[in-house]
């Protein structure tokens, strides 16, 4: 007869997940024009010069330069156009609270910046 203590059930010891903090560098697409029909072809042209550069890249949409009302921004069109280019918008930065709320209603939450924004940028 074994005198070893019974082992606890493995299933009760395993955690189904763990949440951990992490920092990531993300590209910000600063919108200088609110119209997807202007932005999407321009970014598509730029990234065709470097195929695969942003393929499936998560990108944050910068709203701080827009001088229009949130109702004028076609967030669904912008999101759809970027995804067709295989660029994945994951959130927003900057802009008014109304603009951020409009973006949030289409699945783009505000992303908090941990550091001062980098001034290096790629322009069309």
Feature-to-residue mapping (PLM):
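Charge-rich, low-hydrophobicity low-complexity segments
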Residues: 2-124
């Amino acid at each position: 007869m074994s005198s070893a203590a019974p082992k606890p059930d493995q299933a009760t010891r395993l955690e189904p997940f763990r949440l951990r903090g992490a920092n990531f560098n993300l590209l910000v697409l600063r919108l200088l024009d609110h119209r997807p029909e202007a932005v999407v072809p321009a970014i598509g042209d730029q990234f065709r010069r470097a195929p695969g550069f942003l393929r499936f890249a998560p990108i944050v949409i910068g709203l701080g330069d827009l001088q229009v009302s949130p109702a004028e921004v076609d967030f669904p069109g912008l999101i759809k156009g970027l995804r067709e280019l295989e660029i994945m918008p994951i959130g927003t930065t900057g802009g008014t609270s109304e603009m951020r709320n409009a973006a949030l209603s289409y699945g783009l939450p505000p992303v908090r910046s941990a550091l001062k924004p980098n001034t290096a940028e790629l322009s069309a």
